[in-house]
Amino acid sequence: MELSEGELSHTSSSSSFVPVDQRQLQDAIQIIDENKHFNTGILDYINKTSPADVGNNYHIISVFGSQSTGKSTLLNRLFNTNFDVMDESNRQQTTKGIWLAYSPVVSTTLGHTTSKSNILVMDVEGTDGRERGEDQDFERKAALFALSTSEVLIINIWETQVGLYQGANMGLLKTVFEVNLSLFGKSKLETHNDHKVLLLIVIRDHVGVTPVESLAKTFTSDLQNMWSSLAKPAELEHLQFADFFDVTFHALNHKVLQPKEFGEGINRLDDRLVVSNELFKPEYHHDVPIDGWTMYAERCWEQIETNKDLDLPTQQILVAQFKCDEIVESVFQEFLAKYQHHFKEVDAAPDFEELGALFADLRQDAFEDYDASASRYNKAVYEQKRKKLRWLINDKLKEVFDVHAKNLCNTLLEKFEKDLVALKGKDFAVNVKTLSTKLVEDVNFQVSLMSLQGDLSLDEIILALTKDIDAIVAKQQVIELNSIVNKSVKKLSASLSKSIQFELGDPNEETWDNVLQQFKGVYEKFGGDFGLGTSSTQNQQAIEKFKFKSWCQFYDVTHKLISREKLLALLQDRFDDKFRYDENGLPKLYLNEQDLEKTFAVAKQHALQVLPILTFAKLADGSEIVPDYDIFDSKLREQFLGGYDDSDDEEDHCFAEIITEQEKSEVLAKFKKEVDAKYIETKRSIVQHITQIPYYIYLIILVLGWNEFMAIIRNPLFFSLSIVLGATVYVLYYLGLLRPALVVAQRTMDEVIVMAKTKLREVLIDDHEVTGRQLNKMAGSKENIELDDM
């Protein structure tokens, strides 16, 4: 019998246990009774229970689930409604048909909160009730109606039902989704609307052992698989589950055993609904005023009630689907047992042909077992589930397939990498193409032997292999390119070093012109594509890197070859060339101070004239050498050298400045000190030579020693020695070595005299200090000996 307009239920709210003011509660209205009659008085009820101007400011929420699972209680606790709930002492159907109620307030973590939007809640008769038995017609139509008219469909399910087929109402949901797709899928295509329904999966009696995320993953996977198995019209085949539905989850503790945690879970869910407003999205709304929605709901029920297609699929097909799923699961478990036996350990070097044959045998055995048990059921279902079994087996075999394919690729890639290194850059691009082509062909041939005639795709393997090859080649290209750059820089450095060393032999105004010309002769020849198959960008970067490093080498080599110590030594050598040797390269012997002072001034000037040349790299035209790159820039050093010293940022650098002014002053001071010492030493020898023995003394000696002189001449031995001595003096004079010989003889005699005086002092004088020092030395030696013995 159709309900009269505005007729309300007169149920008690005492069983709902809703902690709100009873005056705020509104009785629910039955919009569809158990006889499938639609109540046309919905709009009057809504106008009576809700604010005057509802308009589009409303949300429709419905609940779906098995009978006696606490759906009505859940709605009452969430939305403070007054739906009838089950008497726990007598488990029987409470909700009959579909009921609608207005939510006055919701219970959030902040307390009772009035929603900014009007919330209307539908309580749908539970499924799988004994009152209806096998008559599932109303269950399907009621579920389809709730799905078609609601923004949020709460699927009430116990934790223990997750993963089940019948327990989780998957069969009914599949039927509802299929019919919903056929009824409303064309509308989505024609209007291109983005309307969706949110499936809010509330997991009841969650004990916390299995994480909510894991349960959600299982349930979502079941929904996706179920959608994939729907019998879709051809024009709707491309539509996905996500085109029609969004899914979210919320877990609640046991209502009786954990009442406090249950209440807190209810409050958190209400927070999601009305506080954060995360569950109400514009695309869920039907985008019609409330009076339009009531008309829409009535016409939806009319279409659902009169459409004969809702009687499909038949129970036979449902049974076939269920049984074939059971057979698939059983056969697949048997396959897994064989799989574990054969592939418990991974063979490091398998025979791919034998492995492919084993794959085929295992799969064929599973197909034969499935065919023997499932072929008697509906042919379409049987073939569909056989495809599912094929997919499951292939997916499992793909694991072993991928492992062996990866091992093969890794082994061949290692050899490929060694072959690339062995090339040492010779014909690199050509050889890389040859080696990489051979590698891909080898992998393709070997892996195809176990691919089950292409059922196990090689595309991912070959794609990954190609990427690995490209990565290895790119890495080796960089190594070879860097090697070319470094070798070229080293060659340039050697050439530059030779050029600078040559110029240091006789620096002049064109010294740095010659060095720069030699540098640029090598510097400007570097370039080309290098024969590595690298891109033009990489080649250009290599050229820039070479040029930057070349200028760095120019700076480093010049500072290495022209340091303070080496510059001082060079100045001293140039001074000695003029001061100690004559133009023929023979040692000079100074006989007077005038000659000494003149030569000293010339030698000093000769040495110092190269000081400004070697301390600052300046060309003949007066301009300083400026590099093409600022080699002191930290960013450039980071880019081309891979790092830089932070302390260098605090110093001001000038590329052309080899020796700073301070260092130059230090070198000049040391040089003057050294040459002045040489001047004084040479001058002292002249004075000693002049003041040693007057010439007239030799005349007196000759007169007074005439008799002795004659005795020497008459003695053959003495005469022979005189002849030898005279000849020696003549030869030295003839060769121009007499003066140096006299200097050497004089210095030798001085040393002999000094040593003789020292020995004579030791013998004749009782020097206590000397004796003490000797005793100390002896004592020290003894201690050292004792320490060595220890």
Swiss-Prot record:
GO terms for cellular component: cortical endoplasmic reticulum; endoplasmic reticulum; endoplasmic reticulum membrane. InterPro entries: G_GB1_RHD3_dom, P-loop_NTPase, RHD3/Sey1, Sey1/RHD3-like_3HB. GO terms for biological process: endoplasmic reticulum inheritance; endoplasmic reticulum membrane fusion; hexose transmembrane transport. The keyword GTP-binding applies. One of its GO terms (molecular function) is GTPase activity. It is found in: Endoplasmic reticulum membrane. Residues 1-692, 738-790 are cytoplasmic. SUPFAM superfamilies: P-loop containing nucleoside triphosphate hydrolases. Pfam families: RHD3_GTPase, Sey1_3HB. The keyword Cell membrane does not apply. GTP binds at residues 65-72. Residues 55-284 form the GB1/RHD3-type G domain. Its EC number is 3.6.5.-. Residues 714-716 are lumenal. The chain crosses the membrane at residues 693-713, 717-737. Gene3D superfamilies: P-loop containing nucleotide triphosphate hydrolases. It comes from the Eukaryota. Keywords: Endoplasmic reticulum, GTP-binding, Hydrolase, Membrane, Nucleotide-binding, Transmembrane, Transmembrane helix. Its main location: endoplasmic reticulum. It is a multi-pass membrane protein. PANTHER family: PROTEIN SEY1. Belongs to the TRAFAC class dynamin-like GTPase superfamily. GB1/RHD3 GTPase family. RHD3 subfamily. Cooperates with the reticulon proteins and tubule-shaping DP1 family proteins to generate and maintain the structure of the tubular endoplasmic reticulum network. Has GTPase activity, which is required for its function in ER organization. Required for virulence and resistance to cycloheximide. This is Protein SEY1. The lineage of its organism: Eukaryota, Fungi, Dikarya, Ascomycota, Saccharomycotina. The gene is SEY1.
